[in-house]
Amino acid sequence: MARKTPLNRIRNIGIAAHIDAGKTTTSERILFYTGVSHKIGEVHDGAATMDWMEQEKERGITITSAATTCFWKDHQINLIDTPGHVDFTIEVERSMRVLDGAVSVFCSVGGVQPQSETVWRQANKYGVPRIVFVNKMDRIGANFYNVENQIKQRLKANPVPINIPIGAEDTFIGVIDLVQMKAIVWNNETMGAKYDVEEIPSDLLEKAKQYREKLVEAVAEQDEALMEKYLGGEELDIEEIKKGIKTGCLNMSFVPMLCGSSFKNKGVQTLLDAVIDYLPAPTEVVDIKGIDPKTEEEVFVKSSDDGEFAGLAFKIMTDPFVGQLTFVRVYRGKLESGSYVYNSTKDKKERVGRLLKMHSNKREDIKEVYAGEICAFVGLKDTLTGDTLCDEKNAVVLERMEFPEPVIHIAVEPKTKADQEKMGVALGKLAEEDPSFRVMTQEETGQTLIGGMGELHLEIIVDRLKREFKVEAEIGQPQVAFRETIRSSVSKEHKYAKQSGGRGQYGHVFIKLEPKEPGSGYEFVNEISGGVIPKEYIPAVDKGIQEAMQNGVLAGYPVVDFKVTLYDGSYHDVDSSEMAFKIAGSMAFKEASRAANPVLLEPMMKVEVEVPEEYMGDVIGDLNRRRGQINSMDDRLGLKIVNAFVPLVEMFGYSTDLRSATQGRGTYSMEFDHYGEVPSNIAKEIVEKRKG
């Protein structure tokens, strides 16, 4: 079976948006128009199309899949779903890794919101080219040009409209295509399946010419030959303009911008045309960086059908019919179903039972998957999100994804005994799907704790327990994940010796403990020379320290950001053992940390509050009471924006307090930023409470 769509006709795109910008509707409409069996533009009685929509409504094409395949004008588009909430930035980051391009959807009324800024930053970080779709042009207060300004000011981007709206709110009927210089007007009777290409309305001609001029200028800057032609006063032809838009979009010097109303079925086809005209094929993006697991050297993986198979597992979902689905983006080579594949991240072989391609309303079993495609693998047992699957002959690790540690924990209890086992299984499955979510058992109380990136993240997990796994769970008070670290350097020795008849125990170490940069983690350095401690006992010392650092000396929280140097010691021919050196290492570490000026650290959240000016004073006063540090204040659409770092422990219940302080007009978003030192008076309370 040869590949159906050549690599240069594939588009892997994501639709990234703030929660209310209309992402789902846009995705659904894309699937609707690409799935319509007749060619759009043939004359049909609108009824057939209408029925199709109604049926789909009853069955509901909601994109529940992580990646859906559809076709438009001989191109294959793989739509990768990206979540729209800040607690799930890990998901967004991961989908950014496997996308080649993105459509950023903004609401024509709400414009650029805090979440859209986060997603935009992540797309910049991974170098994802994008086009902007201004949605909801039919809403009251819709203003395309406002959004254009906000993108310039807030996202510091360079938007270049390639179509502009005809009308707005309830008079929005279509768009002016600035490349062709024609008006495109949608026909309400056919659910927008049919549209007419007309001359530009006279009252908009001036504006259209003005924006066309901006577009041509932006295009000319992409290419010297075009620039000469433009400066010489010659007209650029349509092909040249399209080529220039694509160049500018791919090198991210500007962002093509379109508008429409997905809900009212206007502007979706023009958006699809822009996706295939301007967003990159897998062959047009930079080669993917990887690491050779044998040599640890950097290697580059080129998107092509030649070469050994290499792909990245980016999402795991549990499907009621086929079990676990592992979604994989294939970067190089091809793979047949039923064959073996090597997981280079885990150093394990896995067998691929089936390969499934997801369409909006059906699944298709395929025999082979090729470079540039996205496909669900069935039958993988050990593969988790972020793992690389490849051919053992040419192994590569595509990504060492850094998954953030949870900043908040909540105890969960099943409501009935019968749910206990079900809950364990369900939490295990959810943890496999989402690496930023952790499950652990609290030793002292035996309670199950779940950890995540914020209150909302955990609320959604508890909600999924109920909906998908039918487990009713009670949740406890949220607990913050504190950490400990040290502020000064100390050297300590510890001799662990038990030698009273029979086989004794003997381990003796000298260590130096030093603080490191915040966020840099733990480092162990071996400076033993002349065999004063035999080689085979060195890892035991390291292991002893790693076990001891899980329980800090202040309040039993994990200790972070320090370096231990093992520089001297002694051993006994008969009585020394790994166990003895492990204990010696762990005791030396505990004694050293007591003397090294230990301090408590807490998660600091980056908080952004948006309020009308009259509540500004109250909100800032409240953030100060919560030990917040105010970083900046801005204006946005007549509202005041306050940016601050606030300790997570002070933020519980903030949404209710903010609502009552601003009569429901204030909104906020927060995400974890860094660990900061807890002031000593508060640290004292926390320590006393822990030791209780």
UniProtKB/Swiss-Prot annotation:
One of its GO terms (biological process) is ribosome disassembly. Gene3D superfamilies: 3.30.230.10, 3.30.70.240, Elongation Factor G (Translational Gtpase), domain 3 (3.30.70.870), P-loop containing nucleotide triphosphate hydrolases (3.40.50.300), Translation factors (2.40.30.10). Residues 8-283 form the tr-type G domain. Transmembrane segments: none annotated. Its main location: cytoplasm. It is found in: Cytoplasm. SMART domains: EFG_C (SM00838), EFG_IV (SM00889). GTP binds at residues 17-24, 81-85, 135-138. Keywords: Cytoplasm, Elongation factor, GTP-binding, Nucleotide-binding, Protein biosynthesis. It holds the Pfam family EFG_III. GO terms for molecular function: GTP binding; GTPase activity; translation elongation factor activity. InterPro entries: EFG_II, EFG_III, EFG_III/V, EFG_IV, EFG_V, EFG_V-like, EFTu-like_2, G_TR_CS. PROSITE patterns: G_TR_1, G_TR_2. GO terms for cellular component: cytoplasm. The keyword Signal does not apply. It comes from the Bacteria. Belongs to the TRAFAC class translation factor GTPase superfamily. Classic translation factor GTPase family. EF-G/EF-2 subfamily. Catalyzes the GTP-dependent ribosomal translocation step during translation elongation. During this step, the ribosome changes from the pre-translocational (PRE) to the post-translocational (POST) state as the newly formed A-site-bound peptidyl-tRNA and P-site-bound deacylated tRNA move to the P and E sites, respectively. Catalyzes the coordinated movement of the two tRNA molecules, the mRNA and conformational changes in the ribosome. This is Elongation factor G. It comes from Helicobacter pylori (strain J99 / ATCC 700824) (Campylobacter pylori J99). The gene is fusA.
